[in-house]
Structure formats: structure tokens, C-alpha cells
């Protein structure tokens, strides 16, 4: 009703007003930001296991031990204020300086799949850039999200920062997310989630950093180290039960080495479905599937569930040690073309690497998100990287390497492919300001 909408708007306005009072934070300098970020990292380390287990209990998704790894990754490898860069030009006409400035208030939307990791990551990046943040968490993860934000605020005040620099909507809904995204007090949106929430953010007139879905393909050619490929594909695709958008979702393997790849996947924790078992899996996890090269409709009950539980549901016993369900399927099978977000990995045989790359580009659906290849041929790496045009491209490792887990570089849990920022970082959440001093400050 209009009364409920008005009340919701007033409540959010009061919260934003509280944040506005903290904008003195913008005057506190970089040293305080460094201190705050360091203290946030310390407190999050202390509560890492607690938050991981709480997220697992509340959402019912993924694996608690993998959530510990996710949280540890963002705690340690999200960039801080050191990511901000200034530029200076001097010449006969004086000096010009550009500096990264805060936007003010960030309106952030976070998913149920990675609730604490996304909040920690977004907070470190946003505060490093000098911003305040208002979160609208996923309703299915509201308790752990509120608890995480309380701990973060305690860390901020411990470091000498203002109280309630980071706040959240206490009872998040789709409607409260829409209110936040359209509120005049919010200067920039940071949205991490599925296609629905990304499209809602596109409808606003605000600057938006939008991290949407993906369907990351893997290509394995005849030159690949097949033991490495099998091990890394299982490691990546089974991580937190395939909840991360960067996790591997389908494999295209050159037919001459397909059997050896499947053997390696089984040796490293996979369970290869028999033909009769594949039909049972389809009926379990799909509510609708055409197997004509189009996406299926997924039964949400099985999203983020353990491979052993999925196998038990089709009558496979004593499979609790299996991390990944592996399905040998034709290229038009709906598993290939669907972002399942569960540990079920379709593997399709193709005649050569050219066909594998062609299909990988199609299966990625133009999300420009993530892809990977296993090959010893540098030309294949180069060609696929160019043709698939994704934000994260990984060669010869699990796609987790692209997030800094098993690879170099910083991490982010907001991969903004739709809007082009890629891995979101503090400089993504700042605006450039320029100072020009004509005829002065030139010392040579």
C-alpha cells in the first residue's frame, strides 16, 4: 500500500540521514581509512569461522568450510586505500592534479549465495574510497548480514571512525531494494546478484556498478595436462557447491582425450553418472528442459546442495565423499546452457579445439563474465581469451585463480561485467576530481 511505501521510504531516509552525519569521515584523511580497514580485517579474521557457519545455517547453501575460505580470501586480498591513485601534470602553464574522491553514499545489494564475503569485500572497497554504505541484503541471509555489519561498525569505531558508517535495511525485501536504488540520498549503486536485480538497477538514473550472472565454460584440448585439468575443474566447480558466479559451469573437451579427463575428474572427487542416472538427475534438478541448446528451468531446492545429497536423492548410496556430479552429455543438453549453481558438471565431447572455443563462446551467453582453458598451446590461450571476451579468463587452473585463490592479484566478489568495471575495487567506487593551478607550483 502507499502507506507502507511511505513508511519504508521514511525509515530508509532516517538511516541515510544517520549516514549523512558521518560524512565528516570524508574530512578525516587517508590515515584513518588505513586504520579502519586494518581493524575491519582483524575483526573479520576473529569472526571468520562464526560468520561462515552462520551463513551456512541461515541460507542452507554451500559448504561452511568453503565459506571460511571465501571470507578469508576477501579479508586478506580486497584492496585498501593503497588502490587509490593520483595523477599530476606540470608544465610551463602550471600544475594539474587529479585525485579519487568519494561518491558519498553507496547503495549496495548483496546475494544469498555469498552474503558475508560480498559485504566484507564491498565494505573494505567502499570505505577505502571514503564512502558510507547502506546495504540491502538478500532476505534469506538477513540475520548473518546484520551481524556482519554490526561487527564491521564496531571495528570502525574501535579504529577511531564514526559510528554507523555502514548500515543496512533491517528487514530487506525486493521493495526495500527498489526504494534504496531510487533514493535521492544514494549517489552510486553497487549491485551483486542475478539478472532480475541487475535489470531493476538499470531502470534507475543513478550510476550503477552491476555484477550479474555468468555461465563460465571450460575448454580442454588434446595438449592439456589431464591430471591437472581434472583436479582443478573438480576443485573449482565444487567449491561452495558451485554458488559463485565465477565457478566452472560446463566443460567442452576434445574427444580424443575425453575419457582420460573424466577418469581424472573421478579420481579427484567426481562421480560419473551412468546413462540411467543422468535421466534421474534431469528429473530431479530441472522443472523444465528441452535439451535443444536452450537454458532449462532449475528446481531451486537443489541449488547449492552437496553432491552426495543430490546423488542420494536419485538412489546413489555411500557417495558423501564425492564433491562433484559429472555428466557425459551431448552439446545440446540443457545442463550445458544453464547456470545451475549446484555441483553438477556437464562434460561435452567435441571434435577439436576450434569447435570447443566456438561452443564456449555461445554457452557463455554474452555475459562477459568468466571462462577458462586447459592447454599447453599458448596460441590456444591467446585465441580463446580474445574470442570469449570475459572479465576473468584463466588458463590451467580453477577459475578461483582469477579471484586470487591459487593465482596472483587482488580479489572481488562483485564482478561487474555488465557495466565494465570487472573486479570491483576502491578506485571503482571513487570519482575523479581535478585541480588546475595556472602559472604556479612549477618548481623547475
Named regions from a protein language model:
Residues 22, 26-29, 40-48, 52-55, ...:
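Structural signal for hydrophobic packing residues in well-ordered secondary-structure cores
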Residues 2-20:
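Single conserved hydrophobic/aromatic residue that forms the stacking wall/gate
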Residues 41-91:
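Long amphipathic alpha-helix in the N-terminal Rossmann-like dinucleotide-binding domain
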Residues 316-444:
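Conserved C-terminal structural/oligomerization subdomain of aldehyde/semialdehyde dehydrogenase
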Residues 27-31, 162-166, 241-245, 271-282, ...:
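Flexible, glycine/charged-enriched surface loops at secondary-structure junctions
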Residues 120, 147, 198-325, 330-331:
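ALDH superfamily catalytic-core signature
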Residues 86-228:
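Rossmann-like NAD(P) dinucleotide-binding subdomain of oxidoreductase/dehydrogenase enzymes
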Amino acid at each position: 500500500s502507499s502507506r507502507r511505501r511511505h513508511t519504508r521510504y521514511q525509515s530508509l531516509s532516517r538511516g541515510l540521514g544517520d549516514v549523512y552525519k558521518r560524512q565528516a569521515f570524508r574530512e578525516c584523511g587517508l590515515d584513518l581509512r588505513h586504520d579502519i580497514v586494518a581493524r575491519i580485517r582483524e575483526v573479520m579474521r576473529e569472526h571468520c569461522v562464526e560468520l561462515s557457519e552462520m551463513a551456512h545455517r541461515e541460507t542452507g547453501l554451500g559448504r561452511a568450510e568453503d565459506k571460511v575460505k571465501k571470507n578469508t580470501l576477501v579479508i586478506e586480498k580486497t584492496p585498501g586505500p593503497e588502490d587509490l591513485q593520483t595523477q599530476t601534470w606540470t608544465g610551463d602553464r602550471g600544475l594539474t592534479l587529479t585525485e579519487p574522491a568519494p561518491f558519498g553514499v553507496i547503495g549496495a545489494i548483496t546475494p544469498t549465495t555469498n552474503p558475508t564475503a560480498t559485504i566484507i569485500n564491498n565494505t573494505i572497497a567502499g570505505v577505502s574510497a571514503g564512502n558510507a554504505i547502506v546495504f540491502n541484503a538478500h532476505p534469506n541471509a538477513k540475520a548473518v548480514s546484520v551481524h556482519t555489519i554490526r561487527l564491521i561498525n564496531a571495528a570502525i569505531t574501535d579504529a577511531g571512525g564514526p559510528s554507523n558508517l555502514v548500515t543496512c535495511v533491517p528487514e530487506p525485501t525486493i521493495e526495500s531494494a527498489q526504494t534504496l536504488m531510487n533514493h535521492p540520498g544514494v549517489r552510486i549503486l553497487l549491485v551483486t546478484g542475478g539478472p532480475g536485480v541487475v535489470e531493476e538497477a538499470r531502470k534507475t538514473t543513478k550510476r550503477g556498478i552491476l555484477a550479474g550472472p555468468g555461465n563460465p565454460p571450460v575448454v580442454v584440448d588434446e595438449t592439456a595436462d589431464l591430471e591437472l585439468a581434472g583436479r582443478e575443474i573438480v576443485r573449482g566447480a565444487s567449491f561452495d557447491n558451485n554458488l559463485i558466479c565465477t565457478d566452472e559451469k560446463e566443460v567442452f573437451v576434445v574427444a580424443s582425450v575425453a575419457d582420460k579427463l573424466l577418469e581424472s575428474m573421478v579420481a579427484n572427487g567426481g562421480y560419473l553418472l551412468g546413462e540411467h542416472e543422468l535421466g534421474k538427475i534431469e528429473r530431479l534438478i530441472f522443472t523444465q528442459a528441452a535439451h535443444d541448446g536452450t537454458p532449462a528451468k532449475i528446481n531451486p531446492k537443489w541449488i547449492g546442495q552437496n553432491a552426495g545429497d543430490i546423488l542420494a536423492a536419485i538412489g546413489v548410496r555411500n557417495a558423501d565423499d564425492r564433491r562433484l556430479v559429472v555428466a557425459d552429455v551431448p552439446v545440446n543438453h540443457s545442463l550445458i546452457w544453464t547456470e545451475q549453481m549446484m555441483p553438477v558438471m556437464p562434460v561435452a565431447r567435441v571434435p577439436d579445439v576450434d569447435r570447443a572455443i566456438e561452443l564456449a563462446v555461445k554457452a557463455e551467453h554474452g555475459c562477459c563474465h568468466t571462462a577458462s582453458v586447459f592447454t599447453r598451446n599458448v596460441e590456444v590461450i591467446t585465441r580463446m581469451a580474445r574470442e570469449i571476451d570475459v572479465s576473468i579468463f584463466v588458463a590451467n587452473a580453477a577459475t578461483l585463480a582469477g579471484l586470487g585463490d591459487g593465482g596472483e592479484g587482488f580479489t572481488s566478489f562483485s564482478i561487474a561485467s555488465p557495466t565494465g568495471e570487472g573486479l570491483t575495487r576502491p578506485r571503482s567506487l571513487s570519482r575523479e576530481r581535478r585541480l588546475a593551478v595556472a602559472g604556479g607550483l612549477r618548481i623547475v
